[in-house]
Amino acid sequence: MKFDVLTLFPGMFEGPLTESILKRAREKGLIDVALHNIRDFAFDRHSVTDDYPYGGGAGMVMKVEPLAACVEHAQAGSPEARVILTTPHGRPFSHAVAAELAREEALIIICGRYEGVDERVRELFVDDEISLGDFVLTGGEMAAMVIIDAVSRLVPGVLGSEESAINDSFADGLLEYPQYTRPSEFRGLEVPKVLLSGNHQEIEMWRRHKSLEATALLRPDLLQSAKLTNGDRKYLEKSSKDAR
């Protein structure tokens, strides 16, 4: 999986890409992240990449010429890549979107800045627009980092255990069940006995029920699209009655 990131601040990616899972994935050749400094594609000696908006208004707008040149440079190496713009206008990012993007061979991610990009960049190059949520970030770099991390986790071989991705929160539309490790007791709080029983069928049932409970309590909106069995629905109905 290849990621081409178009940014004014490539240094922001140094930490996330050189630690933990992403570092190992890059070392194994499972993912490739290429950073492209948009300033390198400016047409003047001052490397100007933004300008005042036509029609007036506050802030600056990212210029079309350097962005166009930068996108075309990335496309030369990844001609089949989907071009993504990080922007508040975009569709909300989710596990389902990450899974969709993970099926691509390559992604080109444009990191928006300031008041946004010249609209002609959208018209000429952008295939998809993605937002992390209804809040404002300083720039699209942090959104790009989140996209790279979430998508990379779904690339075969990136995680130590394939079950890790399957059991992640949201993988089946539900929040994850509670996790415990040693010691079995801490300050009077004990690990649920079922997890120590060795009965894998009961453990799986406990985890499923706890996942359903957490989702119903914290993110009930997810239940509308979650993959629920008849047993799940009966358990939720019983839990709701017991809580009254």
UniProtKB/Swiss-Prot annotation:
Annotated disulfide bonds: none
The protein's enzyme class: transferase
Keywords noted in UniProt: Cytoplasm, Methyltransferase, S-adenosyl-L-methionine, Transferase, tRNA processing
Top-level taxon of origin: Bacteria
Gene Ontology molecular-function annotations: tRNA (guanine(37)-N1)-methyltransferase activity
Gene3D superfamilies listed in its UniProt record: 3.40.1280.10, tRNA(m1g37)methyltransferase, domain 2
EC number: 2.1.1.228
UniProt subcellular location: Cytoplasm
Catalytic reactions on record: guanosine(37) in tRNA + S-adenosyl-L-methionine = N(1)-methylguanosine(37) in tRNA + S-adenosyl-L-homocysteine + H(+)
SUPFAM superfamilies: alpha/beta knot (SSF75217)
GO biological process: tRNA N1-guanine methylation
Binding of S-adenosyl-L-methionine, residues: G112, L132, G133, D134, F135, V136, L137
InterPro entries in the cross-refs: Alpha/beta_knot_MTases, tRNA_m1G_MeTrfase_C_sf, tRNA_m1G_MeTrfase_TrmD, tRNA_m1G_MTases_N, tRNA_MeTrfase_TRMD/TRM10
GO cellular component, one term: cytosol
Function: Specifically methylates guanosine-37 in various tRNAs.
NCBIfam families (UniProt xref): PRK00026.1 (NF000648), trmD (TIGR00088)
Subunit comment: Homodimer.
Family: Belongs to the RNA methyltransferase TrmD family.
Protein name: tRNA (guanine-N(1)-)-methyltransferase
Source species: Geotalea daltonii (strain DSM 22248 / JCM 15807 / FRC-32)
Source taxonomy: Bacteria, Pseudomonadati, Thermodesulfobacteriota, Desulfuromonadia, Geobacterales
